[in-house]
Amino acid sequence: MSRLLVTGFGPFPTVPDNPSGRLARRLAASPHLRRILGATPDCLVLDTRYGALDSELAPALARRPEAVLMIGVAASRSRVCVETRGVNRVSRLFPDASGAVGRTLAFDPGGPTQRRSPAAAQVRVALRRAGLDAAASRDAGRYLCNASYYRVLGQGCPAVFLHIPMPPRTRRPKAGGRRRRPALDCWAAAFAEAARVLAVRGRARPSALNQAHSRWASFAS
């Protein structure tokens, strides 16, 4: 069983170089995060296709990660956003990387209208303590970010989706000036704290389930 799964996305129409995939790889390879977790997290950069939810995401979830930290890009956002829920809706206006659109307006016709992340508020606090002015968001979109989040939240393990804006270009400093730290580096450092929150919640979950099972067994006997 892997401790933590970190996901990002590959390119899609209008975003030929997706920073979320680069950030996911950078975070998963971070020595700091490995020290926090005591293990190397798994990393999955999803093809931005609806079919990848079954061909790529489902096998990763079948390995039963204890927690999932998901990253996507939202070019219209001005700061990092912590998504509090995934909704059972798909837009048919925006094709994926293969040119396909959602087949139905509901991602899961038999599923609930929304799934919430109990860990979102705690993750936002951790990000803000790490120096990021992270905002809470109730709208993960109607594209692959939302669809994948809705799917993962259905697994029951602690999971949070973080939307990042397009990172600004790092300009050369003026003579005598200091070079600004690249946005991806800043985000990776802060996201390690989000991963810490999820990992702690993930490790506590089996104990809680075992206690609940023991209480039920005692009651049934």
Q: Which residues are covered by each model-predicted region?
A:
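Small/polar glycine-rich anion-binding or flexible loop at a beta-alpha turn
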Residues: 140-145, 166
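Glycine-rich phosphate/pyrophosphate-binding loops
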Residues: 159
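N-terminal catalytic or cofactor-binding beta/alpha core of small enzyme domains
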Residues: 1-142, 153-156, 175-221
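A short, acidic, amphipathic alpha-helical segment used as a generic capping/interface helix at domain edges
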Residues: 146-152
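An accessory alpha-helical subdomain
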Residues: 163-171
